[in-house]
């Protein structure tokens, strides 16, 4: 009986080492590290760890042990959360939706500014615990009441779970601002990555809601604002740049929208979108809307392949405004609150920010744009990770803080 256990104990280290070696090889064979990125060795290390954990998660999923998303979330939620003596942090539930409330302890002579925060993570990663440090910092430095919303994620929940949970929790909070000591004229909606998509979609959905306080401003940190044009210059230039490759994004997009992975190539090639739809939205999606300086490297003009009706029937909900808020009607865009947009040069989603910026400005919406030439997708989450932090991480956080304090 002891022999099988001994063999297993000897085999496990070899297995884990083998997976790590494979992850390192995959990184160096498939990953691009642009020259503008600072601390490239640090980013390489983080990406190798990321690939290692995702690969382990996928193996565990195939063995029926645990799904990859749940495995990763278990790991990042195991990090100890530090208490801040300046804040009261309370975990609540708005119906079935978990939320975390950050409130300054210091007395205030007037109602405070409110922030509603939607975290990122491609609907795969991210949680209240994972983004605790960032939200804690934002609440403390801006002296605001901050509500972070924990929405349902993969693999158990698909579209429109994120939108529904963030929308319902936001409405609940907006109806109870007085309870939390929040000034209804100073509510900011903030989100990162797919959380930025939620910001865009929810601020649009709240347009015309006379029964709720009007959102004062929206903060979108490298958001994804459209789900069907994946050949923009930044998608081509940064398709293999960590921490969000085009391949991983398309896979996550298909999983969240419940699209069979066999249609990934059709989505990449644009064959799942009818020609008349391309013509309708070309004015908003055209690379001509992107400044020339962003198209100087690694971009080849592109046009969609022949229309595939079967792919369209499978993936047509990509065109819903909840999933692609960039294509909302002008009448809706014109009524949106002012925006603070963060984009990173080394990010496949850079051009989403640039295109949404133009859409807002064309409709008279005030936009403050903050672009980081040394930035990459997901960098903000490392701002408080000390040795694993990057200069761009703190730059983004401080820029967001400075903007919100001006509200």
Curated annotation (Swiss-Prot):
<keyword id="KW-0812">Transmembrane</keyword>
<feature type="short sequence motif" description="Involved in the stabilization of the negatively charged intermediate by the formation of the oxyanion hole">
    <location>
        <begin position="119"/>
        <end position="121"/>
    </location>
</feature>
<dbReference type="InterPro" id="IPR029058">
    <property type="entry name" value="AB_hydrolase_fold"/>
</dbReference>
<feature type="active site">
    <location>
        <position position="377"/>
    </location>
</feature>
<dbReference type="GO" id="GO:0016020">
    <property type="term" value="C:membrane"/>
</dbReference>
<feature type="topological domain" description="Lumenal">
    <location>
        <begin position="26"/>
        <end position="407"/>
    </location>
</feature>
<keyword id="KW-0325">Glycoprotein</keyword>
<dbReference type="InterPro" id="IPR013094">
    <property type="entry name" value="AB_hydrolase_3"/>
</dbReference>
<protein>
    <recommendedName>
        <fullName>Arylacetamide deacetylase-like 4</fullName>
        <ecNumber>3.1.1.-</ecNumber>
    </recommendedName>
</protein>
<keyword id="KW-1133">Transmembrane helix</keyword>
<keyword id="KW-0472">Membrane</keyword>
<comment type="similarity">
    <text>Belongs to the 'GDXG' lipolytic enzyme family.</text>
</comment>
<feature type="topological domain" description="Cytoplasmic">
    <location>
        <begin position="1"/>
        <end position="4"/>
    </location>
</feature>
<dbReference type="GO" id="GO:0052689">
    <property type="term" value="F:carboxylic ester hydrolase activity"/>
</dbReference>
<keyword id="KW-0735">Signal-anchor</keyword>
<feature type="active site">
    <location>
        <position position="347"/>
    </location>
</feature>
<dbReference type="InterPro" id="IPR017157">
    <property type="entry name" value="Arylacetamide_deacetylase"/>
</dbReference>
<dbReference type="Pfam" id="PF07859">
    <property type="entry name" value="Abhydrolase_3"/>
</dbReference>
<feature type="glycosylation site" description="N-linked (GlcNAc...) asparagine">
    <location>
        <position position="168"/>
    </location>
</feature>
<keyword id="KW-0378">Hydrolase</keyword>
<feature type="active site">
    <location>
        <position position="193"/>
    </location>
</feature>
<dbReference type="InterPro" id="IPR050300">
    <property type="entry name" value="GDXG_lipolytic_enzyme"/>
</dbReference>
<feature type="transmembrane region" description="Helical; Signal-anchor for type II membrane protein">
    <location>
        <begin position="5"/>
        <end position="25"/>
    </location>
</feature>
<feature type="glycosylation site" description="N-linked (GlcNAc...) asparagine">
    <location>
        <position position="269"/>
    </location>
</feature>
